[in-house]
Amino acid sequence: MNTSHQKIIALLGPTNTGKTYVAIEKMLEFDTGIFGLPLRLLAREVYDKCVQKVGVEKVALITGEEKIIPSTANYFICTVESMPKDKKVDFIAIDEIQMCADRERGHIFTERLLESRGNKLTMFLGSQIMGKIINDLVKNVVFEKKERFSKLSYTGIKKISRLDRKVAIIAFSIEAVSYTHLTLPTTLVV
């Protein structure tokens, strides 16, 4: 599948290290591109950023709930499920590639990992945990690592009402996330 003129990059690193930003900038260096994202809200955010840079007539948004497809679109920002399979483009990126391990949607991410290729560049963005799997499944992949801009550290248990600025709250279930959000002081920006 990978020919000599195609390049495949796995840009891996922790959350919030600028991987998506790098891929947006890289995509816009090419004439055409598809960007697959795991969430429709994230797809909308990337769509808005691309529209600001190149204009509304050059960017399409395709999700399960929303379709904005100008006839002159060169860049297609999509949820991974909505990525056009038959469209040939210079650049393809798939964000949060570690979703290959997801019970419900993993098969779609895995299919894109194995089959989706840009004519010139393909980028897989996500967690370093995917490094070995990508290396085993994708030929001639180049690995690039992104480091976190700032250090995260554990400061112990604190009351939610006494949180400092720039604090990350870690929760391990949707119920814990919902409860935490409901108990946050209304003065905090979430």
Residue spans for each PLM region:
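Inter-Walker segment of RecA-like/P-loop motor cores
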Residues: K53-K85
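Phosphate-binding P-loop
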Residues: M1-Q6
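Conserved strand-helix element at the start of the C-terminal RecA-like helicase core
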Residues: G33-L42, D164-Y179
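Post-DEXD/H (motif II) to motif III coupling segment of the RecA-like Helicase ATP-binding lobe
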Residues: D102-S150
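Conserved small/polar residues in nucleotide/adenosyl-binding loops
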Residues: T180-T186
